[in-house]
């Protein structure tokens, strides 16, 4: 398995016993899979891709289901991916995510990655699985500003990246976000 590898569709259909509703299961590998954080879209606006994280390689990596064919495309191959950080751009041109070493933008056509910001040192994450501790990021509705929780010097900050101007600034110097 590796970045750019295309896997056959794993779609399974089930019928809910109580409602009779048809339910589509996107993945069937025997491992952990999860969607992005609850306020992060799992699709681009054109619904070309369904984005999810799979641990099928033994560590979390980002995949996209190609909606037209159902095939699964592995998008990342990073040993220190922050699994809750993924955020697709609304236009579907890019996928944004972080690793312990930086903030990345992946071109969905070429699968070329660009490091937008290199983290000079690994940000200290807050203990737990809530808020900034999960590394969840968010993107403005116009696909211009990406917000990333970071921690350094024992303090929490929000890093804002202007994706058009390629500039950054930090805000919120607190003990926790």
Model-flagged regions — what are they?
Residues 35-45, 129-137:
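Signature of short aromatic-glycine-proline-rich micro-motifs recurring in repeat-based ectodomains
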Residues 15-19, 49-77:
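Beta-propeller domains
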Residues 41-42, 47-51, 79, 86:
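General structural concept
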Residues 25-39:
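Asp/Glu-centered strand-loop micro-motifs enriched in Gly/Pro and often flanked by an aromatic residue
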Residues 1-24, 157:
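Blade/loop signatures of beta-propeller domains
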